Amino acid sequence: MSIREWFKKKSVERAAEEKEFIMKIERDIIMALRQVYDPEIPVNVYDLGLIYEIKVNEDHEVYIQMTLTAPNCPMADYVVQQVKTAVEDVPGVVSAQIDLVWEPEWDKSRMSEEALVELGLDED
């Protein structure tokens, strides 16, 4: 194996390891978000369907797009700060940017099956 081939192989290995690490960070972020609850609803923000998007870049900076169940939620700042803190506490995360959006509008179809059962909204 030439030195060029060796460096190329190592580069590919490092890229695969980095991709795997980012996937682990994403899984850990979801676990962290499952510890953040809307103060008015006994379901976490992830299973409630309030998290629309999670992106982790190669610098381990996180972007989250989320919403709330209602635009006039009196606890909006609190919930967003709790999400930011939970994400930034995940090992490997450098920083988190939380973008609160109102489009598309949240509805119960975004909830996980567990959340629907917890709130008695399942159709069984």
What does each model-found stretch correspond to?
Residues 1-124:
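Domain-level signature for proteins that mediate thiol-based redox and metal-cofactor handling
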